[in-house]
Design a protein with these regions (language model features):
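A glycine-rich phosphate-binding loop feature that marks nucleotide/adenosyl-phosphate handling sites
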Residues: 1-6, 66-69, 97-111, 147-162
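Conserved SAM/AdoMet-binding glycine-rich loop
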Residues: 1-101
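Short glycine/threonine-rich loop-to-helix capping motif typified by GTGT followed
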Residues: 9-13, 71-80, 113-125, 154-167
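Short connector loops/turns at beta-strand edges and beta->alpha or beta->beta junctions
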Residues: 27-29, 109-112
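Short, compositionally biased low-complexity segments
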Residues: 52-59, 103-109, 197-211
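Intrinsically disordered or highly flexible coil/loop and linker segments, enriched in small
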Residues: 55, 90-93, 115, 141-145
């Protein structure tokens, strides 16, 4: 549910259905970074919306965040853990009995053409892994689960997102090597994609992690 258009009335209408869980998308862990990406919500919006859901009997809350956003610092990652922890405290304050779970789901930022961040470089695999491990330690909180998007998949997405006609050779090589359904981690083969990059002569960092000049043609 969108936190900036959240409606208590909507929850009341759907509460009669099976309460499998609700997903909210703060996107970033601090107000500063939410302002950078123009998210348009405050921490108060987050806790008000989640609190209303808890009061209406929802016991599984999923929070969606993105890491690797432009200007991100480790304070922003700390903010992700802080929000999750505060929600567990909020549930205790409301006092509804029964098991309560918070799932923090993190995806990796992929810059795309025709967006305000199209000139930005994407985090490298090593950076994503370091941040995942950092969050894994920070989110060792009772009743909080952490999962994240495959960093290898994200880097391939970053290469393709702002690729030019030369990427066609990469796609052909990947297909010939048997790559398919690679959007799902269980089908993704980093080894095959690395081989495809080598065969096609494509430098992945040129497309994914390189900062671009504002006058560069996409």
């Amino acid at each position: 549910l969108r936190l900036d258009s959240f409606s208590f009335e909507v929850l009341e209408q759907i509460q009669g259905y099976k309460k499998s869980g609700l997903t909210f998308a703060p996107e970033a862990g601090t107000q500063r970074l939410r302002d950078v990406i123009n998210k348009g919500i405050t921490e108060e919006d987050i806790f008000t919306s989640v609190g209303q859901a808890i009061e209406l009997g929802w016991r599984n809350i999923k929070l969606y965040f993105m890491i690797g956003l432009p200007t991100e610092t480790y304070e922003d990652l700390d903010g992700i853990a802080d929000i999750a922890k505060k929600i567990t405290y909020l549930n205790k304050q409301i006092g509804i009995p029964g098991r309560f779970n918070v799932t923090v789901s993190v995806s990796n930022f992929v810059p795309k053409a025709h967006t305000p961040f199209q000139w930005c470089g994407q985090d490298k695999v090593e950076s994503f892994r370091e941040k995942h491990e950092y969050l894994l330690q920070k989110l060792k909180i009772k009743n909080v689960k952490f999962n994240y998007h495959d960093d290898g998949v994200s880097v391939i997405e970053g290469i393709l997102a702002r690729g030019d006609r030369r990427i066609g050779n990469l796609l052909l090589a990947a297909h010939q090597l048997g790559c398919k359904f690679d959007g799902w981690s269980e089908f993704f083969s980093k080894k095959r994609w690395e081989e495809a990059l080598s065969i096609s002569g494509i430098d992945g960092s040129f497309y994914a992690s390189r900062e671009r000049n504002e006058d560069e043609v996409f």
